[in-house]
Amino acid sequence: MLITIIAGARPNFMKIAPIIHEIIKQKSEGNLIDFQLIHTGQHYDEKLSGTFFEELKIPSPDVNLGIGSGSQAEQTAGIMIAFEKEILKNIPDIVLVVGDVTSTMACAIVAKKLQIRVVHVEGGIRSFDLSMPEEINRMVTDAITDYFYVTSEVAIQNLKNNGIPNNRII
């Protein structure tokens, strides 16, 4: 099983580090699992250096899409175009997205349109404030996600209120 893990901003790397550690552990135990780490470059951060990845004990990203800043539409379109080109080179079984940044939504849409399962870490979180771009990212991502890793009972209830069955919530 190949899992493509998406990170768009510095906090995403901290959230995916334990997931990467577990995948590496499972692979070392002979399980047929591997991952590809893609950084969209949505939030440029000069602190994302080799030292940062060493501290988290994760490898540097396999790919940096280098999207950078721009309007919401420019970022979304740029991420979708670059991610689709990259993912078609080695189609994974699962695309794992994190949080509520534009990269989360854009990569989830691309994966779903290619019939690839989507896992959303921090699914179900809501502010109910549609003036926040992050809330729109969360809602769109959750609408097309196959499996949700949640952080609270409130998130579970939000997903259930949207008709998501228990067997898709972890």
Language-model features: where?
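An aromatic- and histidine-rich active-site surface loop
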Residues: 96-114
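N-terminal subdomain of nucleotide-sugar transferases
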Residues: 1-40
